[in-house]
């Protein structure tokens, strides 16, 4: 095949990028080399439009063992224990083929974690779909949920938390972000940096097929009218093989034979071999004729770019090949010595005794493009002027019913009941709470994790939205009694070639960085997914934040369910009734303008740290952060979980009742405290200058909002739980 500029463009490269390749090589690349460059230089693998801005994120902290740059981030949780975690996107494949796209997204992120020596202990996900009225939404949701459950359940890893949202901006591009946590001892962490010369390079796992070729390139482009033609680029997963691969790798890792290990994810054998060589500042020579293939007559181009799943690349110590082979034979997995490390600092590929590629590693990595793209700064929208006369026509009970049954608020039990959330026996807080919690096996420690995003806030003002979503993650961890330690992010945006989209990305990252730095909540891993658009219609900016925190004694964990009648309910944080960009404004007033609520980072940190003090003194019986839908929505969920009611104090309505109940001011929590502990608890709040108000009392009767408004617990449950089940089953 003749390689020329047009063929390079067909591979997703720009004209100037193709010229740069020819200049670096001092010749025209052959077809295999062109394929390798197209994979390594695409947006998905090279981060060419985002690296310039991501370098400013805070990535260090006293608990950080490994930050961005490896397969996953690693944090120290004490006693020689570490948690490995990361979130990644599988958006484009999941829109084309929802079951396999979601399944292989889960499989890929689990491999990232166990590649580093950690046994996966928990999965989470953040999934976003178009309008419920859109013709594709229901089938896409069903396929994605089945794919996530099908893979995670077969692997025997619990899915402990997640987020699901609906918005018309996802009609043409759904988002599927998968997150995994793993546990490892600090002295058994493995890395992908190759070292030593003449070391054997080993291929293990499944055979290589033609599935997923150009998967990474497809994830670096917008959709058009030919979406169906892209189905062959979607990988096909086999969780049972991955389970075997997990156990085989962990068995091999128990010894001292592994120098470096890398899973074959995006761009397959291409990215895994090049990343190992680049980090080790050496070369790798591979004989592609030795790669186990499941299809006949595969070319070097196909072998290098295949994204067949459940495969690993390992650099071993010399003389350990037979021992390693016995392990993988025992687990019925392919094992092949396909090459060796060299001093050439090149990727050299052979096929049928012919050299088919010869590329200096630095041309693929250090010399890959990096763009400081043009971007537009977003203006902070003006506050909306609400005509409060229209409130007179509204009834609180009717509004609450509508808010609780909103697709973005309602119970997602239909989804998470399809996931095994108790397998492994260490889940101590299941989905549906502020965060999922798993015990660190054999210890009193527990790890809490949540995943959050707020596309509406980020769309209204990206800088504020970026801050808010980090703070939301922080509050969710605080609410279960966990000290927040670190985050991973999945940054989902439209085309970076559009100045407005790029501006959304830049300012969201700035906001994210500011909040992370202030809260001492560093970013240890992540992923960028651009080109989430069909033709020129892009998604709302959707950064998803996966937060991880530590509970030193799992018996101090807190849940959101109300516990006992006559206990006191306090609102922590000041309530000013911010309705702009609230669910009330959008759903009830049909008002979509205005700025998101203001973020006060001092209050966020101070409020959260003070609540942890109260939790550690066992003053707090239940807690829940206040977010979408405001105070009354948060309180309703606490009532539903505990099957208890609450009576609100009438004196709260110093501002308009609807502003008080449904405003989305940030930095707030509802906490339940016994009357006996109230004096001591409020003393701590006052000593730490934390604003609080008495919200009311827990009761057994229902939610009593005022003299005219009482909602039974059964009605709350019905409003909150029925929508999704009815939508999916009718």
UniProtKB/Swiss-Prot annotation:
GO BP term, example: 'de novo' IMP biosynthetic process
EC number: 6.3.5.3
Entry keyword Ribonucleoprotein: no
Enzyme class: ligase
Source species, domain of life: Bacteria
Pathway: Purine metabolism; IMP biosynthesis via de novo pathway; 5-amino-1-(5-phospho-D-ribosyl)imidazole from N(2)-formyl-N(1)-(5-phospho-D-ribosyl)glycinamide: step 1/2
GO molecular function: ATP binding; magnesium ion binding; phosphoribosylformylglycinamidine synthase activity
UniProt binding sites for Mg(2+) 2: 112, 263
Keyword Secreted found: no
Binding annotation for ATP: 47, 86, 489, 526
UniProt catalytic activity: N(2)-formyl-N(1)-(5-phospho-beta-D-ribosyl)glycinamide + L-glutamine + ATP + H2O = 2-formamido-N(1)-(5-O-phospho-beta-D-ribosyl)acetamidine + L-glutamate + ADP + phosphate + H(+)
Main location: cytoplasm
CDD domains: PurL_repeat1, PurL_repeat2
Keywords attached to this entry: ATP-binding, Cytoplasm, Ligase, Magnesium, Metal-binding, Nucleotide-binding, Purine biosynthesis
Localization per Swiss-Prot or TrEMBL: Cytoplasm
Protein residues bound to Mg(2+) 1: 88, 527
GO cellular component: cytoplasm
Positions that bind substrate: 89-92, 111, 235, 307-309, 529
Active-site residues, as the UniProt record annotates them: 44, 90
Function: Part of the phosphoribosylformylglycinamidine synthase complex involved in the purines biosynthetic pathway. Catalyzes the ATP-dependent conversion of formylglycinamide ribonucleotide (FGAR) and glutamine to yield formylglycinamidine ribonucleotide (FGAM) and glutamate. The FGAM synthase complex is composed of three subunits. PurQ produces an ammonia molecule by converting glutamine to glutamate. PurL transfers the ammonia molecule to FGAR to form FGAM in an ATP-dependent manner.
Similarity remark: Belongs to the FGAMS family.
Subunit structure: Monomer. Part of the FGAM synthase complex composed of 1 PurL, 1 PurQ and 2 PurS subunits.
Name of the protein: Phosphoribosylformylglycinamidine synthase subunit PurL
Organism, as annotated: Pelagibacter ubique (strain HTCC1062)
């Amino acid at each position: 095949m003749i390689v020329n500029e047009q063929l390079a463009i067909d591979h997703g490269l720009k004209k100037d990028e193709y010229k740069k390749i020819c200049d670096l090589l001092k010749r025209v690349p052959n077809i295999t080399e062109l394929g390798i460059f197209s994979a390594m230089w695409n947006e998905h693998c090279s981060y060419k439009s985002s690296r310039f801005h991501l370098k400013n994120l805070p990535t260090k902290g006293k608990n950080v063992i490994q930050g961005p740059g490896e397969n996953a981030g690693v944090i120290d949780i004490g006693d020689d224990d570490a948690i490995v975690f990361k979130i990644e996107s599988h958006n484009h494949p999941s829109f084309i083929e929802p079951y396999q796209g979601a399944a292989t997204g889960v499989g890929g992120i689990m491999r990232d974690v166990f590649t580093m020596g950690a046994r996966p202990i928990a999965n989470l996900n953040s999934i976003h779909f178009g309008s419920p009225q859109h013709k594709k939404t229901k089938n896409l949701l069903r396929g994605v949920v089945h794919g996530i459950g099908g893979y995670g359940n077969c692997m025997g890893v619990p899915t402990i938390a997640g987020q699901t949202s609906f918005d018309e901006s996802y009609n043409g591009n759904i988002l599927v972000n998968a997150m995994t946590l793993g546990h490892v001892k600090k002295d058994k962490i493995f890395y992908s940096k190759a070292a030593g010369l003449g070391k054997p390079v080993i291929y293990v796992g499944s055979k290589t097929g033609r599935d997923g070729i150009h998967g990474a390139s497809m994830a670096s482009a917008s959709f058009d009218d030919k979406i169906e033609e892209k189905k062959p680029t979607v990988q096909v997963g086999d969780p049972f093989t991955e389970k075997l691969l997990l156990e085989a790798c962990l068995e091999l890792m128990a010894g001292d034979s592994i120098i470096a290990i890398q899973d074959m994810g995006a761009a397959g054998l291409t990215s895994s071999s090049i990343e190992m060589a680049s980090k080790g500042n050496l070369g790798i020579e591979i004989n592609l004729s030795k790669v186990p293939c499941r299809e006949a007559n595969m070319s070097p181009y196909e072998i290098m770019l295949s994204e067949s799943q459940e495969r690993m690349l390992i650099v071993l110590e010399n003389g350990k090949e037979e021992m390693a082979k016995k392990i993988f034979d025992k687990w019925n997995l392919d094992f092949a010595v396909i090459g060796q490390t060299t001093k050439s600092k090149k990727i050299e590929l052979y096929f049928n005794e012919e050299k088919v590629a010869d590329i200096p590693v630095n041309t693929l990595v250090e010399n890959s493009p990096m763009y400081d793209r043009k971007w537009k700064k977003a203006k902070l929208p003006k506050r909306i002027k609400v005509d409060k006369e229209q409130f007179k026509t509204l009834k609180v009970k009717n509004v609450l019913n509508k808010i609780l049954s909103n697709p973005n608020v309602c119970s997602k039990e239909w989804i998470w009941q399809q996931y095994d959330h108790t397998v492994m026996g260490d889940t101590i807080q299941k989905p549906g709470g502020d965060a999922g919690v798993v015990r660190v096996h054999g210890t009193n420690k527990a790890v809490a994790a949540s995943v959050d995003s707020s596309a509406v806030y980020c769309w209204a003002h990206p800088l504020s939205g970026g801050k808010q979503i980090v703070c939301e993650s922080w509050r969710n961890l605080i609410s279960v009694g966990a000290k927040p330690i670190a985050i991973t992010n999945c940054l989902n945006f439209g085309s970076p070639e559009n100045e407005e989209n790029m501006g959304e990305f830049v300012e969201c990252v700035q906001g994210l960085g500011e909040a992370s730095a202030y809260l001492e909540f560093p970013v240890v891993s992540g992923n960028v997914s651009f080109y989430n658009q069909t033709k020129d219609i892009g998604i709302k900016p959707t950064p998803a934040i996966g937060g991880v925190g530590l509970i030193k004694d799992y018996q101090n964990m807190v849940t959101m369910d109300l516990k006992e009648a006559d206990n006191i309910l306090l609102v922590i944080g000041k309530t000013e009734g911010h309705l702009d960009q609230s669910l009330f404004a959008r759903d009830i007033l049909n008002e979509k303008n205005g700025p998101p609520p203001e973020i006060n980072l001092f209050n966020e940190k101070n409020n959260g740290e003070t609540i942890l003090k109260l939790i550690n003194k066992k003053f707090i019986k239940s807690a829940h952060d206040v977010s979408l839908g405001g105070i009354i929505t948060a309180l309703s969920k606490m009532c539903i979980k505990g099957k208890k009611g609450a009576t609100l104090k009438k004196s709260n309505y110093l501002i308009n009742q609807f502003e008080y109940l449904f405003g989305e001011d940030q930095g707030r929590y509802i906490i339940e405290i016994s009357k006996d502990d109230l004096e001591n608890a409020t003393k701590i709040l006052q000593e730490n200058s934390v604003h609080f108000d008495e919200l009311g009392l827990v009761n057994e009767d229902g939610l009593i909002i005022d003299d005219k408004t009482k909602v039974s617990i059964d009605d709350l449950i019905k409003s909150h739980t029925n929508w999704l089940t009815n939508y999916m089953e009718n």
